[in-house]
Amino acid sequence: MVRISLDVMGGDYGPEVVIPGAARALERHPDIKFVLFGQEARCAELLAKYPKLQASSTFHDCEIAVGMDEKPSQALRRGRGKSTMWKAIDAINADEADVVVSAGNTGALMAMSVFCLRTMQGIQRPAIAAIWPTLKGESIVLDVGATIGADAQQLMDFALMGGAMARALFEVERPSVGLLNVGVEEIKGQEEVKEAGRLIREANIEGIEYYGFVEGDDIGRGTVDVVVTEGFSGNIALKAAEGTARQIAEYLRSAMSRTLLAKIGYIFAKGAFDRLREKMDPRKVNGGVFLGLNGVVIKSHGGTDAEGFAAAIDVGYDMVKNGLKAKIEADLARYHGAEPTEALPPA
């Protein structure tokens, strides 16, 4: 059984997306037990439409929902101990949940997660890891927004955590890790990036294969399993990729509807275009993972639909099933020369 707590009020649409999304995830993973935190007046009628979900859930009524435009400091002051977001996170501390999933305000979710769960021993700052579609399948990119201007040691930590996530998600024994840079030559880039490369190379970490520097176009190519960068450039890369995907989709839509001949051609090529659309569907890779905390936190896109939210739940489910937290702790323990605090799950 995997216990998943949900911030039902999070996101642009709240329970109207979260509840049907949870129902879809339950169809795929019948061993999920949900712990729901929401406002009963808005959720009860909708939840009643999904009897299987209702039977596999416990619901906790909360008085406060965090707004999508609230500042993290304001959300903490107003919602600590009372909001749906805080209580969903705190369910991990109370041993009621193994992972929390929220589509809510990213800054507030990160602030509450750090305040409530704290960072792992040896981790200075957390990172947000995104699953990225590539020509070879999928890769992991971190950090995509949590730590702006990370130093060399923090980038080293991100490499450790990203490698552990790749082993948990992709089930590769020794994932390849690259540092995002302006060139692949050792003399190029900021001092923090060059120093991080030296740290990773000299550490000779058992669980990862250090590839060296990678450039922006290597992300989509799938050159490495894990791309490490600091939060400013990572977030820009993520938003640029999402915008490019939408741009290409719009170009195709416009080109295929411009003339009668184009419309006829689309009919014959519809299968190929459908496969392309599915490959570029952002819902398929929805679910950023907050790494470096004493608990697994999944951030869904705020504007996603039920299928996208279900995909974020899928990510959380896989992270728990494959022992993400234990893998990160074991890698940190090996790097720092200490004993892991939690036993690794059996292979």
Curated annotation (Swiss-Prot):
Catalytic activity annotation: a fatty acyl-[ACP] + phosphate = an acyl phosphate + holo-[ACP]
Q: What does this protein do?
A: Catalyzes the reversible formation of acyl-phosphate (acyl-PO(4)) from acyl-[acyl-carrier-protein] (acyl-ACP). This enzyme utilizes acyl-ACP as fatty acyl donor, but not acyl-CoA.
Which organism is this protein's natural source? Sinorhizobium fredii (strain NBRC 101917 / NGR234)
**Keyword Lipid metabolism set for record:** yes
Q: Which family does it belong to?
A: Belongs to the PlsX family.
- The answer on whether this UniProt entry bears the keyword Transferase reads yes
InterPro entries recorded: FA_synthesis, Phospholipid_synth_PlsX-like
Q: What is this protein called?
A: Phosphate acyltransferase
